[in-house]
Amino acid sequence: MTIPTEATRPDNGFIGALHVSGPADEHVDKLMLFGQFVGSWDLEWAGTGANGEPATATGELHFGWVLGGRAVQDIWIVPGRGQPGEGQPPSAFHGSTIRFYDPSIDAWRSTWVEPVNCRVRRFVGRPAGGDILLVSDEEDPQLRWRFTDIGPDSFTWQGKASHDGGRTWVFEEQMRATRRRSR
């Protein structure tokens, strides 16, 4: 199969139609809940490896404004591009989340898409004290993703799962993010 030449051109219109430089004026205060993360980050991942043993890896994370500044999209890559194990399931992941503020529920709707491991999950996110908590309870296992220890140049992301309808939660993984400085 041949890829059409138009699709491979960097100026094909897709990037310009998707990405914007900042938030939309409407709900700008609410948009900054995730807008504060716009930029590039280095990740230190810790979790359980494919063999069931504790594992660590480094990766990368990129946040940007999309869809007219009404949403924030991110790309999580662990291990990072060019690192051993990149793109090799089940331990690696390379996925994207699109999040937008929905004033009808005063919360963020969020969808995670991760083709390496064939995952799609929907979440609802809200501020929780100084943290941000995202909950996915439409299918098993239920998931809780938390942004915590949030500062201008670092944060921690934690993932937990419940296999009993939310009665108990098990730690799955954690990522420490450090903002990249302009190079």
Sequence positions of predicted segments:
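Tryptophan-centered short beta-strand motifs
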Residues: 41, 53-55, 89-91, 108, ...
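Short, surface-exposed coil-to-beta transition loops
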Residues: 56-60, 91-96, 118-122, 140-144, ...
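Conserved Ser/Thr-centered positions that define the repeating blades of beta-propeller domains
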Residues: 160-162
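Amphipathic/hydrophobic helical signal segments and adjacent flexible N-terminal regions
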Residues: 1-54, 62, 66, 181-183
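N-terminal glycine/threonine-rich, aromatic-flanked beta-hairpin/loop signature
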Residues: 55-93
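Helix-adjacent hinge/juxtasegments
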Residues: 78-120
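Acidic, glycine-rich flexible loop segments
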Residues: 126-143
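Residue-level recognition of beta-strand termini and adjacent short loop/turns
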Residues: 67-68, 151-153
